[in-house]
C-alpha cells in the first residue's frame, strides 16, 4: 500500500511508480489487428483495450473486480454563501449512499462495481480559503493517505467520485489556479445556484486566487482544496502503485487531480475520463490536460456517476477484445 509523507515526496513519485507495460500494449494491438473486423473499426473501444492491457500488464485484460470510491468532505468556504444547501446535506447524502438510495448506488450496481463511501471529518470543515489556506500540509497528506489506503489492490478498475456541499466552488478555484484564467471561466451552477449564488462563488474564488496564487500543485491542493478532493488524488496515486487503471468522473474529480497534473502530468497516465460534465469548466480542463472523455451525457451530478456509466463501455471494450475470434480462427483469409 502506498504511504505518503510529504509534498516533497510526491514531487518525485512519477519517477518511482509503475509505468505502462509497452510489451503488453503491443501484444494487445497485434491481437486487435487480427480480430474479425477492419483495423480500427471499433474506434475508442480498441484504445481502451490497449490501455487496460498496458496498465494490467497482460495482452488480454479482464475486469474481475471493479471498485468505486466516493469520498465526502465539508468546506469552510461555504461560509461565503457559495451553495444553496447547508453542509448538513453532506451528512444526509452519505447516509443515502450507505442505504443504497443514490444515483451512484444504482449505476454501480448496473456496472458491476463495488461501492465504498468514505467520510473525512464531516463535522470539521476545512478552513475558509478566502481567509487562509484550506488545509495544512499535514492535513492534506493525511487525506491523501486516506484515499491511497482505500484502494483495493486486487481490483482491475477504479472509479473515483465525491460528495461535498460547496465542492464545485473548490473545483473551479483549483482549475483556475492550475490552468489560469478567472473564476468566471470555470464557475457553473453546481447544485443549482442562481445568479446571485454564482456571483458569490465568483467573488469567493477570486479572493482565494488572489490570496493563494503562484503555488505548486500540492500547495494549491492544500490552499484551495478539501479533504475529499485530496483523498481522490491519493486514490489515483494508490491505484497507480498497484497498476490499476482509473476512471475519473466529471468536473470535480478532474479538477482535483489537476493538482497531480501540475506536479507531473505522468501521474495521470493510467487515468481515463468517464464523461464530459455539463459544468462549463470541465471541457476547458480536459482540453488543457489533453484528455478526451468517453461519454457526453449532459450529466453534472458528481458522486462518480459518469465514471460508473463509463465502466460499462470499458467492460464492452474488453469483451470485444477477449471474446472476438481472429481471422485465422474463423478460417477467413485475405
Curated annotation (Swiss-Prot):
SUPFAM superfamilies xref list: Nicotinate mononucleotide:5,6-dimethylbenzimidazole phosphoribosyltransferase (CobT)
Keywords: Cobalamin biosynthesis, Glycosyltransferase, Transferase
Protein name: Nicotinate-nucleotide--dimethylbenzimidazole phosphoribosyltransferase
Pathway where it operates: Nucleoside biosynthesis; alpha-ribazole biosynthesis; alpha-ribazole from 5,6-dimethylbenzimidazole: step 1/2
Coiled coil: none
Entry's family note: Belongs to the CobT family.
Catalytically driven reaction(s): 5,6-dimethylbenzimidazole + nicotinate beta-D-ribonucleotide = alpha-ribazole 5'-phosphate + nicotinate + H(+)
Signal peptide: none
Described function: Catalyzes the synthesis of alpha-ribazole-5'-phosphate from nicotinate mononucleotide (NAMN) and 5,6-dimethylbenzimidazole (DMB).
Active site: 303 (proton acceptor)
EC number: 2.4.2.21
GO biological process: cobalamin biosynthetic process
Lineage, uppermost ranks: Bacteria, Pseudomonadati, Pseudomonadota, Alphaproteobacteria, Rhodobacterales
Annotated GO MF terms: nicotinate-nucleotide-dimethylbenzimidazole phosphoribosyltransferase activity
Species whose genome carries this gene: Rhodobacter capsulatus (strain ATCC BAA-309 / NBRC 16581 / SB1003)
Amino acid at each position: 500500500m502506498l504511504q505518503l509523507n510529504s509534498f516533497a515526496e510526491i514531487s518525485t513519485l512519477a519517477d518511482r511508480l509503475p509505468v505502462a507495460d509497452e510489451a503488453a500494449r503491443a501484444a494487445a494491438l497485434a491481437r486487435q489487428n487480427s480480430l474479425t473486423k477492419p483495423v480500427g473499426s471499433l474506434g475508442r473501444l480498441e484504445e481502451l483495450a490497449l490501455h487496460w492491457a498496458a496498465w494490467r500488464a497482460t495482452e488480454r485484460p479482464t475486469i474481475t473486480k471493479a471498485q468505486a470510491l466516493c469520498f465526502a468532505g465539508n468546506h469552510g468556504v461555504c461560509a461565503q454563501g457559495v451553495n444553496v444547501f447547508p453542509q448538513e446535506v453532506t451528512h444526509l447524502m452519505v447516509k443515502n449512499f450507505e442505504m443504497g438510495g443514490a444515483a451512484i448506488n444504482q449505476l454501480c450496481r448496473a456496472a458491476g462495481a463495488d461501492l465504498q463511501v468514505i467520510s473525512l471529518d464531516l463535522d470539521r470543515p476545512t478552513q475558509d480559503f478566502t481567509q487562509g489556506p484550506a488545509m495544512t500540509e499535514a492535513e492534506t497528506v493525511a487525506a491523501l493517505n486516506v484515499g491511497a489506503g482505500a484502494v483495493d489492490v486486487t481490483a482491475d478498475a477504479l472509479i473515483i467520485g465525491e460528495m461535498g456541499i460547496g465542492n464545485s466552488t473548490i473545483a473551479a478555484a483549483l482549475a483556475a489556479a492550475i490552468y489560469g484564467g478567472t473564476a468566471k471561466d470555470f464557475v457553473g451552477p453546481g447544485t443549482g445556484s442562481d445568479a446571485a449564488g454564482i456571483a458569490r462563488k465568483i467573488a469567493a474564488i477570486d479572493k482565494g486566487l488572489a490570496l493563494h496564487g503562484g503555488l505548486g500543485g500540492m500547495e494549491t491542493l492544500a490552499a484551495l482544496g478539501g479533504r475529499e478532493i485530496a483523498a481522490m488524488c491519493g486514490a489515483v496515486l494508490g491505484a497507480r502503485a498497484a497498476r490499476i487503471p482509473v476512471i475519473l468522473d466529471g468536473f470535480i474529480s478532474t479538477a482535483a487531480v489537476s493538482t497531480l497534473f501540475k506536479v507531473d502530468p505522468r501521474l495521470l497516465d493510467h487515468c481515463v475520463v468517464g464523461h464530459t460534465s455539463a459544468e462549463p469548466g470541465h471541457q476547458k480542463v480536459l482540453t488543457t490536460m489533453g484528455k478526451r472523455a468517453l461519454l457526453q451525457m449532459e450529466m453534472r451530478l458528481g458522486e462518480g456517476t459518469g465514471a460508473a456509466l463509463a465502466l460499462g463501455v470499458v467492460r464492452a471494450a474488453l469483451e470485444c477484445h477477449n471474446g472476438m475470434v481472429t481471422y485465422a480462427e474463423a478460417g477467413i483469409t485475405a
